Structure formats: C-alpha cells, structure tokens
Amino acid sequence: MQGSMGLAPAIGLGMSLNTTRPVVVINGDGSLLMALGATHTLRDRAPENLFHYVLDNGCHESVGGQPVAALESSYPGVTEIIKVARGFKPSRVSVQPEENTRRIREFLAQTLPAGGWMRLPASARAQGR
C-alpha cells in the first residue's frame, strides 16, 4: 500500500478479521506516524493472524525522503516511536542492519499477534509515482 498515508495497519486489520490466513503488514515509520491510532486499535483487537512490522528509515521515503521528526534527536538510541510500536506486543527491535535477516526469521516464528521493528538506511530514490 505504498502512498496509503498511514492506512496499511487499518487495511491489514480489516483483512485479518475476515480471514484465518496470516496477514503481514509491512509499514514505514513515516506511515506509522501518520496514523498512530492504528497501533492502539491493533493492540486492542489483537487479531491472532496479524503480523505488523515497521521498517524505520527515519524519513517519509515514498514522498521525497523528508525526515521523520520523532527520530531526529534520539537515533541511534531507543526512540519515542519505538515505544509506541511496543504497544502492539510482542515486538522485536533491530537497529543493526546485519541483524535484520535473523530478526525477520524470529519475527515470523512468533506466536500471533506480533509486531516488530527494523532500522534501515534511507535511500531517498524516486518511487515511481
């Protein structure tokens, strides 16, 4: 759902409530900031077939790479936005790129519902829109 401006978790929640199959939502940190209320709703509904994973590159990548203000002052430490993501538990936090493959495997092996977080470098390249 590139360009959905924060709607990916809500769409994933709707899908997960209408199927027994696993639903994987891969969200961006900028997108998450656009609809923080979705994390509260996901936590409260806690669908047993939903994975919500946040890719944190510190910017709104798909619309030009503008920095995400919540991350500017605290990266590489634990950020305020990660604390929000932890509200949808259990979550994993990865800030080292070399850990990402292992973290993804661990994440997918979790008991559902699950949430996760991965820090990535920004590319700020044109997204074709």
What spans do the regions from the language model cover?
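Thiamine diphosphate
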Residues: 1-128
